[in-house]
């Protein structure tokens, strides 16, 4: 898993502008660049497949050629435009694209590429322990693409699950929750996006909460945790937070813990929180750049 993160970071840094030894350092990063870099580092911490490091130039050329000839991105798109787009995709996106195109299925990633990442490996072990105890978990992530990856892992491990995120039809949400909460339900896991699933839902069918990636605002994660702490819950609730050591994850958790002392009204002010997050991103990036 550590090698995966290092390879992803190296791939990311190779795409960044660099300056020769002895040259003047680059100008300070603006907010847009800081946010983009920070998001990139968060992706690496969550799962290396969220960036591109496994698909090299040869694979990119093959994928681009097939997609161009088959008009996957529109028959009017030139090969150069197709290749430019394909290069911008993450390993997971490319894996899905290859799976959709029969001629490229040989380029799909192996199961080890999904479950070998640090967080995913820890999650797989944790789920085995939870299942053995007869417990059932809610798994929250801020990223829909992370939920996509977790779906793949859960299927591979044979866990039954349901999912709810921002794209879930409003009329289906209660049906999904009812199916999970139903006494004797054989659905083991409930995947939720932190914001979409963080309010108004009663999910007392679970007694375990797993926060896959923490939010800068601790109140957001607490709202997610509260899905288990609702009227009708008769069991103790256990909360797990997955944090990748040596990454921006650790700093986010530290910042969130400091904010717990702030008034809830302040934390609910979107303008204040946006400014706080921007400041935190700058601080973290500056520390990483030394």
Task: List each language-model region with its residue ranges.
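ASCE P-loop NTPase motor core, strongest for the SF2 helicase catalytic module
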Residues: 1-70, 78-290
